[in-house]
Amino acid sequence: MEKMVVNQPLHLLFVDLEKSYDIVPLKNLWKALEHYNISNNIIRAIKGLYENPFSKIKVGKQLSSRFYITQGLRQGCILSPTLFKTYIQNALENWQKKCSRMGLEIQDTTIYSVLFADNHLLIAQDYEDLEYMTRNLIDEYELWGLKLNVKKLNI
């Protein structure tokens, strides 16, 4: 990286979200897909995967009655990372506006973060910026019902 070549500090924070896929309200996911102009046909197809999902719990030999699941993305589904990213995109856009002068400048581009599924890497040139970025990310995520897994934060 350029920062290493010119011997300038670079601060990274690895962020993991707590139970992120499990808490996505499906009604809000459909609204987010509509907000980003995903076609109605695609939204209907995705809704079909989530239509009336239910579970039962077995304890010993006893099986519970079925109960319906109204939130959460499917674990292991190839669509889940993309659906999750779409769900939190508005929060990330608001966060990036607040942190617009921070991050790592490479040529004409500023990189604030890298996101893969529910794992997030924050990038800053100094510790104070990283702290500011982290506080604002926590605030934005909380508005969407998401929490950082503090036990898995790594600087």
Question: What spans do the regions from the language model cover?
Answer:
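Nucleotidyl polymerases of mobile genetic elements and RNA viruses
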Residues: 1-155
